[in-house]
Amino acid sequence: MDSLRDVKPIKLIFSIFCLVIILSACNSTAELPRFVQPPEPDGSLSFLVVGDWGRRGSYNQSQVALQMGKIGKDLNIDFLISTGDNFYDDGIISPYDSQFQDSFTNIYTATSLQKPWYNVLGNHDYRGNVYAQLSPILRDLDCRWICLRSYVVNAEIVDIFFVDTTPFVDRYFDEPKDHVYDWRGVLPRNKYLNSLLTDVDVALQESMAKWKIVVGHHTIKSAGHHGNTIELEKQLLPILEANEVDLYINGHDHCLEHISSINSGIQFMTSGGGSKAWKGDVNDWNPQEMRFYYDGQGFMSVYTSEAELRVVFYDGLGHVLHRWSTLKNGVYSDI
């Protein structure tokens, strides 16, 4: 029986988070909200990453969820990460929108997936009621759900920084077409972005963790449909490079992908295959940087210990597609 192990850490995390929010409110300096994620007794952590998924089980979402449950059990995962676009096509309209149950609670039902889910917002989520996804009511409906715009998960040997990337993208403001975006809490935009970039930079500088992982919905580097996000290349990437981030994990492109930068030690991982994928939609890329690309559904796992970080990509049938690992001394390996 692992029910106590599943439930108690979630309650502990929420309690610590509430305390952090209270303390932050008394502090005049801006600071990203923080969660504390307890590691395993040996200090290691294991988690799954999935993105671009919320389609009421269609486009193989249920099949991917099934395999996530199996792999999650095998790895005894501690938590999960969603890279955004949690609910298609236009987010949710309220905390009581049936999409939440139909696309999340009733899909990811495996015992191994009853762990904290750390979520970021994607552009499709911004087309709905953003405050609904951020509402604590969702945590009352399903205690796994954790979603803020930007925040940090502290897990001793690894710090994970979640960044709200949608407001960086110019075309959502300049050329929204028929889409209506919920920009409440984001405007004035320049002030929001400047504050966010400062907060992320400060949080990264203050991190004492062995590993630093940044999660955002949008790509920084990708050979997929959307390609590179120029705004993030110009504004966010220099901060990540200056602070020696190990991984940048994103969704947005509906594929699985690993790009190894030749300009820095950052590894760019795309996990956007949670449901609908874009078969054959891939652009040319420098073969020295492209480690792996898969134009189908799937997800990835991450394992961290004091000395090692391991990433594995799986397809919708649970087959291993790509493995990569690194040691903190800079030794890399495609397994």
Curated annotation (Swiss-Prot):
Residues that hold substrate according to the record: 252-254
List the residue ranges forming a coiled coil, or say none. none
The active site is formed by 226 (proton donor)
Cofactor detail note? Binds 1 Fe cation per subunit. Binds 1 zinc ion per subunit.
E.C. designation(s): 3.1.3.2
Catalysed reaction equations from the record:
a phosphate monoester + H2O = an alcohol + phosphate
Where's it found, cell-wise?
Answer: Secreted
Is Metal-binding among the key words of this record? yes
Q: Which UniProt keywords apply?
A: Glycoprotein, Hydrolase, Iron, Metal-binding, Secreted, Signal, Zinc
Instruction: From the UniProt annotation, give the residues forming the signal peptide.
Output: 1-30
| Spans through the membrane | none
Q: In which tissues is it expressed?
A: Expressed in roots, stems, leaves, flowers and siliques.
Q: Which cofactor does it need?
A: Fe cation; Zn(2+)
Q: Point out the glycosylated residues in this chain.
A: 60
Listed binding positions for Fe cation are 52, 85, 88, 254
| Any single Gene Ontology cellular-component annotation | extracellular region
Molecular function in Gene Ontology: acid phosphatase activity; metal ion binding
Q: State a single Pfam family of this protein.
A: Metallophos
Q: Which SUPFAM superfamilies match?
A: Metallo-dependent phosphatases (SSF56300)
GO annotation terms (biological process): dephosphorylation
**Residues involved in Zn(2+) binding:** 85, 123, 217, 252
Q: How does it assemble?
A: Homodimer.
Entry similarity comment? Belongs to the metallophosphoesterase superfamily. Purple acid phosphatase family.
Q: What is the name of the protein in this document?
A: Purple acid phosphatase 8
| Organism field | Arabidopsis thaliana (Mouse-ear cress)
